[in-house]
Amino acid sequence: MAKAKFERKKPHVNVGTIGHVDHGKTTLTAAISAVLSKTYGGEVRNFAQIDNAPEERERGITINTSHIEYDTPSRHYAHVDCPGHADYVKNMITGAAQMDGAILVVAATDGPMPQTREHILLSRQVGVPFIIVFMNKCDMVDDEELLELVEMEVRELLSEYDFPGDDLPVIQGSALKALEGQPEWEAKILELAEALDTYIPEPERDIDKPFLLPIEDVFSISGRGTVVTGRVERGIVRVGDEVEIVGVKATTKTTCTGVEMFRKLLDEGRAGENCGVLLRGTKRDDVERGQVLAKPASINPHTTFESEVYVLSKEEGGRHTPFFKGYRPQFYFRTTDVTGTIELPEGVEMVMPGDNIKMVVTLIYPIAMDDGLRFAIREGGRTVGAGVVAKIIA
């Protein structure tokens, strides 16, 4: 049994299936599980197990998601599949299932459909970096030219949303036939696995990214100075490092003169750890919750951005009524609420609970942000929406 322990050393990559209803996302997920476990070992999850997706709650939002795992010789994959369109929307916006790459499933019998387009747009908005296409149900199309036409359509659609439509891998296969164990179609699943391995680059680990710590609390320790505490989101902070305090007010520079965890002094604080960072020459009043401590020049404060937002339904504890332009809720980033105003797209008068919508948000003061940052929309402490920064404007 030494092998299983060794497997953990393989790079871990998060992927998922996206695409129109009934184009075969769940069947493909089951086929990948079956073919890869047969070829490389691992646990098989059948269609019924995947289709019966457990209900999860992410930031108060109900999402049905199935998680499966599989291995190729060089990598370990975690794969998400959702039963309904609404689950995809919620999953992608809340970042409940962050994807390093997505498998877009398009039935060759139908070609691209409305949700195909919507999932590609969502992938663009929430920052899914890579898409691989699996053209499904190819066993049902005899006409070679028709297959070529569908492939061309899908590639054009992806290019329309700034994905490299001409260059990304498109695999023509049949998930059902692969699941039934027909060798020619099983080979297509292995071809898809090969595309995952080669086309999606190994994701950068949190610890290798530039240091960032969202400040949760500030203390002054007599004779030592000011300590900020929080959980390191990414990177490493070492004693002696220069750091910036970003957001809310003008950015200031200081130096980390100590790191402590559970009252012990350390040389560094790493991604995932809760720690206190001692700052040189910083006054207690210079720093507040809602700011971040970061590697200099790695992140900037912004107030205006385009976002993709999911508005909670009444059943999820959201609003019972729509909202209109002029709506001024709080936007909760990392550790703090900031009031902001919204601008709705041309021709949209109101937003109903349960909708997803693109909106431009302007905050009353700046917050440290990058594209892809998640936030909640709150009214008096109650979450009424979830969003993601799609594009920073100012």
UniProtKB/Swiss-Prot annotation:
GTP binds at residues 19-26, 81-85, 136-139. The gene is tuf. Residues 136-139 are annotated as: G4. The keyword Amino-acid biosynthesis does not apply. Its EC number is 3.6.5.3. This is Elongation factor Tu. Keywords: Cytoplasm, Elongation factor, GTP-binding, Hydrolase, Magnesium, Metal-binding, Nucleotide-binding, Protein biosynthesis. Mg(2+) binds at T26. Residues 19-26 are annotated as: G1.
